[in-house]
Amino acid sequence: MIIFPAIDIKDSKCVRLIKGDFDKMTSYENSPFDQAKIYFQSGFRNIHIVDLDGALEGRSSNSNIIKQILKNLNLKIQIGGGIRTIDDVNNWIKSGVDKVIMGTAAVENIDLLKTVCERFKNKIAVSLDVKDGFISLSGWKKQTNISAIDFVKKIENFGVSRIIYTDINKDGTKKGPNIKDTVELSSKVKIPFVISGGISSIKDIKKIKSLNDSNIEGVIVGKSIYDGDIKINELAKQI
């Protein structure tokens, strides 16, 4: 199972949100590059990065910071936030990212998703931000009436390399992930899932690992690292 430490970037800073609420945002001292370096030096090789400015504005405004990380650290990065066009996807892949995460654009333009999956094989991940079973878009500002299960079924044969499933009700709360819903949804399709939102302890990580579920590819850990609830060296032992 892959453990993805997270870096969320807004206004060139590392931040975390609670339940996707930008009014409940905490900024942290370390720069995104310094944080990535800490992860790298601790033994992590897979990093989850979200450009929150990009998610809100529909275009990446922190790309130079992310490219600095790519250039200087030997990391496999999955990048999301503001990726809405084929050019966006192409630019990130040329920059050297491992996976490009499509969220809003994947849901609003399913033909685009199909096209990029065909063109960039095994490079496209889809981020599903889910609240009460329904997908949210645009940095969680827009709630839809599209059910997560219906959407996942629709894209099952496109060639999506992984689905990042975030339960917005759990995200940033450190109250434990929504393992039940993620496992249930992942069992219905052939696409690997990554669990995101609410990880609060090493115990949560061990619980997910103990499932030994081939449909669960990994887990994203964010706020609990920044707040010191999970120590990096302890998390590294779970790699």
Features from the language model and the residues they span:
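Conserved anion-binding
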Residues: 12-15, 19-23, 97-171
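Charged helix-capping and loop-helix junction motifs
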Residues: 60-67, 110, 141-150, 175-184
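Catalytic cores of alpha/beta
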Residues: 73, 77-98, 180-215, 235
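Structural preference for beta-strand elements that scaffold enzyme active sites
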Residues: 2-6, 46, 74-78, 99-101, ...
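Glycine-rich, proline-tolerant flexible connector loops at the mouths of alpha/beta enzymes
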Residues: 46-64, 104, 109, 165-175
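N-terminal active-site wall of soluble small-molecule enzyme domains
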Residues: 41, 48-95
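C-terminal helical cap(s) of enzyme catalytic domains, especially alpha/beta-barrels
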Residues: 111-119, 209-239
